[in-house]
Every structure is written in C-alpha cells, then in structure tokens.
C-alpha cells in the first residue's frame, strides 16, 4: 500500500472541532498539500545543489510568499524545529514524498520544516473553508467551500491559483 503523501486522517485532526468534512474535500485538501510539497521541493532543488536538501531552502522560499502567510508559516516551522510545538502530520510520509520528487539525501530538519509548512497551510485552508461553510449555514465543509475560500483569500490564491477542484 503506497501511503506517500496521504494526509486524510491528519487533516481531520487539524480541522475545527465543530466542523465536519466530506470525503471529496479531504481528497481535495490532500491533493493541494501534495501540490504544495512538490512545488516547494522543486524550487528548493533549484536553489540548492542536487546532493542534499536542507531546511534553509524551505525557510528562504517562504519569504517570497505575499502577505502574512509566509511569515507566520516560517514562524510555525521554526517553532517546530526548536521543539516548541508538536507536529500532527507524519514526517515519514513527507520524507517519502520528498524522496520521490528530489534527491536521495534529505536532512531531517528539511523534512520537519516541510511537514510544518504543510500542516500550517492545511490549518489555514481548513479555517477559511469552515468560515465559508458557516456563511452558507452549514457545518460540513464541501469542495465548493474550499474553492470559495481560496479564491477570496489573496495569499492562498497566490499559492494555489485557479486549480480545478472536483466534487461539486
């Protein structure tokens, strides 16, 4: 069973307590996180040589993100690296995803940093989607809510763009 980049169970743990999420929405958020991980690892490989991948490259890439999203995700990643916060997402799945797309030598701090970035972005997506579902007087997050939340949030829209979200 190939579990590379499957975060469904952990996305449920990050979602707001009084929210419910459909299966299609879980797949959508999971696909968005895998897209983000692949995008960041490709950019990090361009910055650093192909031999090793370190966490500095990911933190440097976060400075290019517009607005407060990059700054806050960088703070979250640093707090995870220095042991101030615990991760919910598994680092092994992120490491396998990185190995599939990049070089063979990856530092553990790079894995932790990327996992923290994915977890932070997932939390932001879930928060925005739940507030969008609340506006529609629903407790269950659907793919429409995710799409609307991303299109309304300027920073998330700059990261994910107008991607096709299935399950309408």
Swiss-Prot record:
Domain of life: Viruses
Coiled coil: none
GO MF entry, a single one: structural constituent of chromatin
Inducing factors: Expression of viral histones begins 2-4 hpi and continues along the infectious cycle.
Protein name: Histone doublet miniH2B-H2A
The UniProt record lists the keyword Lipid biosynthesis: no
InterPro entries, sorted: Histone-fold, Histone_H2A, Histone_H2A/H2B/H3
Keyword tRNA processing: no
Source organism of this protein record: Melbournevirus
Main location: host cell
Compartments reported by the entry: Host nucleus; Host cytoplasm; Virion
């Amino acid at each position: 069973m190939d579990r590379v980049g499957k975060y469904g169970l952990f996305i449920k743990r990050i979602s707001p307590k009084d929210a419910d999420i459909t299966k299609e929405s879980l797949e959508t958020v999971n696909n968005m996180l895998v897209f983000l991980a692949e995008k960041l690892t490709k950019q990090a490989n361009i910055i650093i040589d192909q031999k090793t991948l370190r966490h500095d490259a990911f933190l440097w890439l976060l400075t290019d993100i517009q607005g407060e999203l990059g700054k806050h995700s960088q703070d979250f990643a640093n707090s995870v690296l220095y042991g101030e916060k615990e991760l919910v997402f598994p680092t092994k799945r992120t490491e396998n995803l990185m190995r599939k797309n990049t070089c063979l030598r990856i530092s553990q701090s790079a894995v932790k940093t990327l996992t923290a970035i994915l977890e932070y972005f997932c939390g932001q997506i879930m928060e925005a989607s739940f507030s969008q579902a609340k506006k529609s007087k629903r407790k269950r997050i659907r793919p429409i809510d995710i799409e609307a939340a991303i299109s309304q949030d300027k920073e998330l829209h700059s990261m994910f763009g107008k991607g096709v979200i299935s399950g309408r």
